[in-house]
């Protein structure tokens, strides 16, 4: 059996290109469920720790399906642009042999879900709307694994596989806090697309000469500290410019960083904020040296950021 870091193993093995669904209720988030899996797959052990998994082999899955073994109650996977911490143990359905497992709780790197779609895309719809804190068993028939998936796993072509996923953490796809009223004049305004992506409207007039920030959405999640490793969306524009110089939205997934390692104005603005919040930040032109180095921001101009705080790792 191979034991791989979570990012490597799940990137290679687990297809999670997920479609959107409502996070409000499990009933509005249908997942293809096959209750027969429960009669042939057994996974024991605490959630978040490597489970002992057995399969009553030879098991020949007739169709792809999912069975929830532990039902979580946290954030649901609702977008293919989210980040997540996921562990997985994989078994050969025909022999019951364990093929690969991640390191379980040792990896604190949040993985973009779109990156987890490479080898076995047929897993994608089976994890739709799975909640943080859930352990799910997924059975994939050989016909859905395909030659590439079988080779990646090390099973004979035509044989199926069983995956047991522990979904340790699911990060927000966008800030979901309550809108806040701000009376400050001279600050940019923010508009949002349906998926939450912000657009920045720069007002007429000169930029502020001191760093300023506003909370424009207030979340109710964990409080961010200077030592926090945060998952954030960032949209950055130069004052008066019409195009972004930095955009995790355009990159396709949020980023992860330690707050104290961010440019000073950004770090100061989000420290003390809560997960789910969206923060508007203006950095005067004479304070952008760190932004130029870290984010390739343009020189000699004020900068404007919108930061969505999507979660704290650890």
Task: For the regions a language model picked out, list residue spans one by one.
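Cross-family detector of peptidyl-prolyl cis-trans isomerase
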Residues: 2-314
